[in-house]
């Protein structure tokens, strides 16, 4: 495991009680929030606009900063700081660029899809506590 902090910006997109998650071609069995790393000089919102366009071909609206989460990046196995924004989408998302698939989850779907630890252990509980993602059932 490397000790270099990875900074990531991600979107929590909830529709019809389900959270949008994506998998990467490099690790198609693990699902993350859509988003990515900022380019030099790019702020968090600009990063998210660029990443969602590149990865899903959509533009987010109503960006609201939810929280910063710290953990270990599932793919890189390095310390991570993930800034998460709530957003809605204009258009239908489709996986592109480095993405393999997308899925919608309640977070209580068992191991389908397999969620990255930060999503499973931090983001989903935060979304439930804030009322953005309801408990299933």
Regions found by a protein language model. Name each.
Residues 26-31:
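A conserved beta-turn-beta hairpin within the catalytic core of GNAT-like acetyltransferases
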Residues 1-19, 37:
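Conserved N-terminal beta-strand and adjoining loop/helix that marks the start
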Residues 59, 69-94, 103, 107:
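Active-site-adjacent beta-strand/loop module that shapes the phosphate/pyrophosphate-binding cleft
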Residues 17, 36, 50-51, 105-108:
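Structural detector for helix-capping/boundary residues
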Residues 84-86, 94-131:
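NUDIX/MutT-family hydrolases
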Residues 1-2, 135-137:
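Actinobacteria-biased recognition of intrinsically disordered, low-complexity terminal regions
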Residues 33-66:
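The catalytic Nudix box helix
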């Amino acid at each position: 495991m490397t000790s270099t902090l990875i900074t990531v910006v991600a979107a929590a997109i909830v529709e019809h009680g389900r959270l949008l998650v994506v998998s990467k071609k490099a690790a198609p069995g693990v699902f993350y929030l859509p988003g990515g790393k900022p380019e030099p000089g790019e702020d968090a919102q600009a990063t998210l606009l660029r990443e969602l366009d590149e990865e899903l071909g959509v533009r987010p609206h109503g960006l609201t900063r939810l929280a910063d989460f710290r953990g270990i990046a599932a793919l890189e196995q390095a310390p991570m700081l993930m800034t998460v924004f709530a957003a809605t989408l204009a258009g239908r998302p489709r996986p592109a660029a480095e993405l393999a698939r997308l899925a919608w989850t309640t977070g209580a779907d068992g191991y389908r899809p397999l969620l990255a630890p930060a999503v499973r252990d931090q983001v989903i509980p935060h979304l439930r506590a804030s009322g953005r993602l309801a408990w299933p059932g």
